[in-house]
Amino acid sequence: MSNSASSFTGVSSGYTAGTPVPADSPIRDNIADAVRRVRETTPLAQSFTTFVTINLVANAQLAAGGTAAMSFLPDDVIETAKIAGANYINVGTLLPFYKDALPEIAQRLNYLDKPWVLDPVAAGIGRTRTAILQAFKAAPPTMIRANASEVIALANMWGLNTETVGDASEHRPAGVESVDDVESATGAAVALAQYLTEQHAKHSSHDASTRCAVAVSGIADLVTDGETVYRLPGGSAMMTKITGAGCSLGGVAATYLAVSDPLTAALSASLLYNRAGEVADTTSHGPGSFQVAFLDALWNVTAEQVAESEILVQ
């Protein structure tokens, strides 16, 4: 399965709930600094991602200013991880040997204290995918990037208190599409972020005060470190018309994770995507030209423009 564009809608909808983050907030300074650092240092982020969208993932990482490495063999992944600033695992398309290989890779990344982003594409569908995602609970990522249904499914799979309304069995992604809105995934996202932070505090040699993050893509994206919930209105409806928008966002999040803390990385990547989508909307005439314009916008949008984007505290 591929992570299709509709798992990252990013459509401007007039979402207004929440308190605006002040213009002089340190959060905005951190975001601008992350965007600049990526462009100045071109950090390497390794991706283990779906065959369907691998090209867009790599090109988006390059357009954002980073360096891309795409790996599939476990030994390649581990060796490359030693020199990469961060890593990205996407479970969109699977082969039988991944059932053992991916959990082993996750364990090695954590042993090496290498930050990594998980995109749990189509969480809850298929025994192999479910087994892999369940195994990740014991070797969790530093950040999760997903749509609302995937976040809810993963939190339920890990037995976390998600505060999900209704029968949890009803909250399943329709393939790689989200059948839940972002708001309904708030409890699951917070629970996941708290769990990731607790686990990494126990086992990582990094600063124990650093919190992990979860980014939920949708009409008004949600990003949380388990303590504060941010909403990010904006983007373009055309993002739903190109496959790989969500997958590539995960890759770019890993690029930012190579130079910043998880919350800053998640906010920076999501805001960059919203801004680039809005810019591409003004010059494109359909999905093909939008994708080209979008990559150009990832390259041209300034750090100041990203940091000045609308950010609301829920």
From Swiss-Prot:
ATP binds at residues 145, 217. It is an enzyme of class 2 (transferase). The gene is thiM. Keywords: ATP-binding, Kinase, Magnesium, Metal-binding, Nucleotide-binding, Thiamine biosynthesis, Transferase. Its cofactor is Mg(2+). Pathway: Cofactor biosynthesis; thiamine diphosphate biosynthesis; 4-methyl-5-(2-phosphoethyl)-thiazole from 5-(2-hydroxyethyl)-4-methylthiazole: step 1/1. The keyword Kinase applies. It catalyses: 5-(2-hydroxyethyl)-4-methylthiazole + ATP = 4-methyl-5-(2-phosphooxyethyl)-thiazole + ADP + H(+). Catalyzes the phosphorylation of the hydroxyl group of 4-methyl-5-beta-hydroxyethylthiazole (THZ). Pfam families: HK. GO terms for molecular function: ATP binding; hydroxyethylthiazole kinase activity; magnesium ion binding. Substrate binds at residues 70, 244. Its EC number is 2.7.1.50. Transmembrane segments: none annotated. Belongs to the Thz kinase family. One of its GO terms (biological process) is thiamine biosynthetic process. It comes from Bifidobacterium longum (strain DJO10A). This is Hydroxyethylthiazole kinase.
